[in-house]
């Protein structure tokens, strides 16, 4: 295709065309003249005029066929844009008119009642096929719900938090202390240790150890006291003035009953029975008691070699059976502890050495029995080690013939009551044991054997008597009958003992060396003989020591040395808070605000939280009953019950208030009894470590670190109602819409005659509902500035049926149609008196004893006018509009809704559906236009759906891409057309 002519060429061409036209019609000009004229025109200098330039511009725009087609395409595009713009403008004008039309008015507080008769058939006995309808009246009661909100009882109290306090506590469990208080045997001790280990190990298996920023309790005085008291409360070290042992191998203690099983009265087992020498009838030939037992007599007691060592310089004992009258077993354990601590404070002066007045007179010439009592005659029966190791002198109580030179012939002289006892019948009226010796003398000690028998020979001791007199000496000591009693004093060792308290040593040394180091050293000191003294029975916990070092050496090592450096390192690295988070353990619910753990801003709590009395507590303090009055197995059962309950409570993160003094807490917080009930109920606990501090076959010790989080209430709301927002249905512009009012409250509270509307923030459920913030708000529709409430509209499909069974036996119904004469669109509470079917569901009657609630919340009356296109608004985009009780201010809401709707692109999605939607919206406003739009929409979606509908729909979804491509092509076309315009360069 040839390019367009230049301006000079076009002017010449234009003149030549005009010359040809003029010469064709002329007959006077010859052909030669015509050629001459054309040559002149071609050679003529051309000066284009403005008119020529304009005409040349039009020529260049349409010089070729492609340029003509481009102009035609541009005109078509512009025409389409104009037509579509006009259509959109008309549609938006109509849309604006539809928006400005006011919609329906929702008015609540309407009560309806209906009775209808569903037919039920009944057979007649004469004919099985014949059935007659029998009317049965079913009553349906319907009550509309104000503002589409139902209020159901909220049984849980709502607690408003004033603050949260964090308290820590260490619980110590030592089975040996428990066993000693309950006087358990070794077998029962082992069972108790197994029970404690089982419960604590099961707790430890489900708890992880970590650290919380509360400070180490081992640095606190209360922890040191409790730990030392638990381990060494009744442990003392006695230092002889000069080492000296028991003088003989024998021990005469006829005041003690003998062991064995005897008919009639039986005595409680005595500790001294372990040292009893039984008289055997048969012995090997030439057997001699002196060769085996030394000076100890058969039928009496001997002193073991382990106790009768000459080089013993100290005695270590752990027993509370040496205390004087101030320590009463009828007192509670806490009272005795308080008395003991006061005694030790008064009887020591900055060291573990007791003052002389604390000792009995037997131990010191300055003794006044301030702490310990005198050893009596019967103590040797139950505490033989005490007498052997600690007596400075011993008074033997003997009924043996020959002691004190007493013989049968001298009884009348020695015992006035026995005068003439063997010379007349006076003995017939006296006790059978009266005026007799327990053991009688024989001529000599010998064995008599049969010929050839060497192993089993009859043995005749030097002193002998019948075993039936096993309680002879005890009855004589009780003065039940006259008897020739010989009492001889034996000097054992010198007075002026020095006594040291291991509890005081532990408490004082811990301040210097640390509790762990001191416990380690003192426990080793108790285990000096290979068996811990504090694990022995109270009556037998006395051992002799040879020049022990006291106080023991305390190695200058760190605390982690004894608590395992590896374990401490692991606690600080692996089990820290970051590790817990990575493992999935969240402490958010347990330790909410670490800064509140030590809340000492309150003057009433400054001393309490720092010096928390129950920061450290032992299991013995927390038991409900005094186990010292229980039998062995009953005490174990009682403690097992407590431990199991404690473990269960800790697993549920609750607090076992048996282990914490609520009276102290109530006094510090100055709360009433009812408030303390709430505090106890919602308090939470957290176990942050469980560790075993000691273990042996018969004893075990555990520690449990507890963190308590106490929520202090500011106010407690009772008698509450919960909000169930069911909403309302609206049918408008061909669209079913679910409308709900967003009330500013969730709870209605009724206290006395005052009704409060509560908005809850930052709440959590822990038996009760605990909220950090509770705001009292105003309900909707009370014509105040703060009562405007947002309304939410949601497009739903028909048919819409929502039935919610209520706890009182009624049903909450919201439906778009009517059934059983239940009105549509209005939320209603429906109650029936017989089972019936509505909306395809069975409605059943409530319980017979059901009664209507006495209190029903009342709300201000509210008439709500909605926009005409509320359904379409909700379908296109969820709009939040505020609703007030006045009709004038709703116009402002409609204006805001109109502005929002006009901003929307109404051509998105399916074009036929949108046109039909516009027709439905226009139906009530402009019926003719609505019919036309409906016809267009039906045509596009019906007959021409395959062509236009789908195409338009696809174009609608691809509109952004198509518009972009179209704009690019249009720009290219415009630039092309502009390039055709002749410029100065082209014109030249």
From Swiss-Prot:
Task: Describe the processing and modification events after translation.
Answer: Envelope glycoproteins are synthesized as an inactive precursor that is processed by host furin or a furin-like proprotein convertase (PC)-mediated cleavage proteolysis to yield a functional heterooligomeric complex. Further proteolytically processed through regulated intramembrane proteolysis either by SPPL2A and SPPL2B or by SPPL3 in a PC-mediated cleavage-dependent or -independent manner, respectively. The transmembrane protein and the surface protein are N-glycosylated.
Glycoprotein in keyword set: yes
Q: How does it assemble?
A: The mature envelope protein consists of a trimer of SU-TM heterodimers. The N-terminus of leader peptide specifically interacts with Gag protein. This specific interaction between Gag protein and Env glycoprotein may allow particle egress.
- Share any extra remarks: Foamy viruses are distinct from other retroviruses in many respects. Their protease is active as an uncleaved Pro-Pol protein. Mature particles do not include the usual processed retroviral structural protein (MA, CA and NC), but instead contain two large Gag proteins. Their functional nucleic acid appears to be either RNA or dsDNA (up to 20% of extracellular particles), because they probably proceed either to an early (before integration) or late reverse transcription (after assembly). Foamy viruses have the ability to retrotranspose intracellularly with high efficiency.
Pfam family, any one: Foamy_virus_ENV
**For side Lumenal, which residue ranges?**
89-960
Q: Which organism is it from?
A: Simian foamy virus (isolate chimpanzee) (SFVcpz)
Q: Which GO terms describe its cellular component?
A: host cell endoplasmic reticulum membrane; membrane; viral envelope; virion membrane
Any GO MF annotation of the entry: protease binding
What does the protein in this record do?
The surface protein (SU) attaches the virus to the host cell by binding to the cell receptor. This interaction triggers the refolding of transmembrane protein (TM) and is thought to activate its fusogenic potential by unmasking its fusion peptide. The transmembrane protein (TM) acts as a class I viral fusion protein. Under the current model, the protein has at least 3 conformational states: pre-fusion native state, pre-hairpin intermediate state, and post-fusion hairpin state. During viral and target cell membrane fusion, the coiled coil regions (heptad repeats) assume a trimer-of-hairpins structure, positioning the fusion peptide in close proximity to the C-terminal region of the ectodomain. The formation of this structure appears to drive apposition and subsequent fusion of viral and target cell membranes.
Q: Where is this site: Cleavage?
A: 126-127, 571-572
* Glycosylated residues in this chain: 109, 141, 183, 286, 311, 346, 391, 405, 423, 527, 556, 782, 808, 833
User: Which ranges belong to the motif Endoplasmic reticulum retention signal?
Assistant: 984-986
Q: What is this protein called?
A: Envelope glycoprotein gp130
Which regions of this chain are Cytoplasmic-facing, per the record's topological domains?
1-65, 982-988
TM regions (residue ranges): 66-88, 961-981
Origin: domain of life: Viruses
Q: What is known of its domains?
A: The ER retention signal plays an important role in establishing the intracellular site of budding.
Q: Where is this region: Involved in virion budding?
A: 1-15
Query: Where does cross-link Glycyl lysine isopeptide (Lys-Gly) (interchain with G-Cter in ubiquitin) occur?
Result: 15, 18, 34, 53
**Keywords, ordered alphabetically:** Cleavage on pair of basic residues, Glycoprotein, Host endoplasmic reticulum, Host membrane, Isopeptide bond, Membrane, Signal-anchor, Transmembrane, Transmembrane helix, Ubl conjugation, Viral envelope protein, Virion
Annotated region (Fusion peptide) at 576-598
